[in-house]
Amino acid sequence: MKVLSLLAAASAASAHTIFVQLEADGTTYPVSYGIRTPSYDGPITDVTSNDLACNGGPNPTTPSDKIITVNAGSTVKAIWRHTLTSGADDVMDASHKGPTLAYLKKVDDALTDTGIGGGWFKIQEDGYNNGQWGTSTVITNGGFQYIDIPACIPSGQYLLRAEMIALHAASSTAGAQLYMECAQINIVGGTGGTALPSTTYSIPGIYKATDPGLLVNIYSMSPSSTYTIPGPAKFTCPAGNGGGAGGGGSTTTAKPASSTTSKAAITSAVTTLKTSVVAPQPTGGCTAAQWAQCGGMGFSGCTTCASPYTCKKMNDYYSQCS
């Protein structure tokens, strides 16, 4: 059997994640300031749902009456946490590997626009590079997702949609878990005109359940494997207009975090390399919450799901409560 390195979960309940704060132009805004945050950290799994735009539905979001000012051409940081009260050492379960992405949509009123429908364009993506996933980079960075705001887009109000996709159960259709929230921002210092990227996209509509970046067995991948990031190509400013030429393809990925970009280094617990399946053991009557891991190769946490959920096998490496 192929030797596998299995990341140990710190807690069965620490699986999910929320975009809770935005840092812009040196200011870290309070939790939920200018962001439509939910009280529950569950995923969206139906890529045809309107909830794919800015979350909601199974994870009801709370409106915010704040808009955050962001300079065109600057780098902002979407700050991710397991819950609204978690710290930098509790971002997302390390087993939840996948890409990170960010999109912008120009709107008339960032406070009231639902985000549903057209007008979206991708401005950030980090997929898989030499064995490193975008989500792992965010965890290593203490929850920071670095997002460059294009310098060439018009000033005005936008929705900034930050997203992390977990692929641990994505070997079957609708197994990918998508996490996203929308920040309400006002971009200043942009171009004086009204031109936007020539092509924009609709959410829902940017993904299909059968996209190779959403229907994939990550456990069969090697460090040299190629991964196709979901969604359209990333927008970049034309040469001589605040950025590099053209729009990048989505089959290449951003480099993993380096010591110069890490805000905080968080060491992930790693189990000993295993060459055989270890049967999970009961853990004193504990129960796992909805969407939490409850089984899989090398797993030794809670194997009983809280009522009314049951433990369902997604693949040999991951079972979850649903």
From Swiss-Prot:
Predominant subcellular localization, coarse grouping: secreted
Which CDD domains does this UniProt record tie to the protein? LPMO_AA9
Write down the Pfam families for this protein, in alphabetical order.
AA9, CBM_1
Instruction: Give an example GO cellular component term for this record.
Output: extracellular region
Keyword Cytoplasm belongs to the record: no
Glycosylated position list: 228, 236
Q: Tell me how this protein is used.
A: Lignocellulose is the most abundant polymeric composite on Earth and is a recalcitrant but promising renewable substrate for industrial biotechnology applications. Together with cellobiose dehydrogenases (CDHs) an enzymatic system capable of oxidative cellulose cleavage is formed, which increases the efficiency of cellulases and put LPMOs at focus of biofuel research.
Q: Which cofactor does it need?
A: Cu(2+)
> What role is this protein assigned?
Lytic polysaccharide monooxygenase (LPMO) that depolymerizes crystalline and amorphous polysaccharides via the oxidation of scissile alpha- or beta-(1-4)-glycosidic bonds, yielding C4 oxidation products. Catalysis by LPMOs requires the reduction of the active-site copper from Cu(II) to Cu(I) by a reducing agent and H(2)O(2) or O(2) as a cosubstrate. Active on tamarind xyloglucan and konjac glucomannan.
The name on file for this protein is AA9 family lytic polysaccharide monooxygenase A
Species the sequence originates in? Neurospora crassa (strain ATCC 24698 / 74-OR23-1A / CBS 708.71 / DSM 1257 / FGSC 987)
